[in-house]
Amino acid sequence: MATYFVGDIQGCLDELLLLLERVEFNREKDQLWLTGDLVARGPKSLETLRFVKSLGNAAVTILGNHDLHLLAVSQGISRVKEKDKTAPIFTAPDSEELLTWLRHQPLLAVHSEYDIVMTHAGISPQWNMATAIDCAREVESVLLSDKWVLLLENMYENYPDTWDVTLSGIDRYRYIINAFTRMRFCHLDGRLDMECKLPPQDINSDELVPWFELENRLPLSHKVIFGHWAALMGHDGNNVIALDTGCVWGEYMTMYRVDDGKYFTQKAIEQ
């Protein structure tokens, strides 16, 4: 049995299938862990959802910001973004089944054997593992309740930007969602910055640092594997591995076999 982690697919199914073929992935005994954002700008978002769902227990996937946006669009809360290729999902005969399946996916998954925690964007530097897990399960329970549409209606804000155990209601849920699915940089005092999307090397300010480099970040018992931030181009350090390497932007898709620490890459196919 082998366990593979792969960065954001964003509808780039062909590249994923090539990687799985290269490593001779066997759904009967291997596992594929996906860092979220199954859908968005790639050409096969619908097919990607169908494929990952078809893997059953052989796949572990989590919710990314594009996945949550897809759910919001399905409820008329937001519109399909101009460059997204997700419209076919809403007219597919299995649309409701796929969207319900997606809504049942977690924000955080733990691989106990290898002491790895996987989220889409990372873990708030103000959380330890116990808090991160509790916060993920808290929002996941709302997504599975009759309040899920209300939650998605109110997630599109950048505040609150700092964690406080006294946060409650939609403010609390919004911080949790932003930390797990949108976070990149933090201010030196731990506040989340939701505006800057530059590569870290292009930042001129001393006030912003990647969330995983914050000096007073709480220590975690597990290594964090995440996607979301293509500009990191596969950063491996600070007890984190960033697996989004910009396939949807014409770069490549990265897969990591945790059993032996080997990486596999697939160049983006020209569309």
UniProtKB/Swiss-Prot annotation:
Write down the EC number. Answer: 3.6.1.41
What's the top EC group for this one? hydrolase
What InterPro entries does UniProt report for this protein, alphabetically? ApaH (IPR004617), Calcineurin-like_PHP_ApaH (IPR004843), Metallo-depent_PP-like (IPR029052)
Molecular-function annotations in GO: bis(5'-nucleosyl)-tetraphosphatase (symmetrical) activity
Q: Which Gene3D superfamilies is this protein grouped with?
A: 3.60.21.10
SUPFAM superfamilies in the record: Metallo-dependent phosphatases
Q: Which UniProt keywords apply?
A: Hydrolase
Reaction catalysed by this enzyme = P(1),P(4)-bis(5'-adenosyl) tetraphosphate + H2O = 2 ADP + 2 H(+)
What family does this belong to?
Belongs to the Ap4A hydrolase family.
Q: What does this protein do?
A: Hydrolyzes diadenosine 5',5'''-P1,P4-tetraphosphate to yield ADP.
* Protein's recorded name: Bis(5'-nucleosyl)-tetraphosphatase, symmetrical
The source organism is Aliivibrio fischeri (strain ATCC 700601 / ES114)
The gene for this chain is apaH
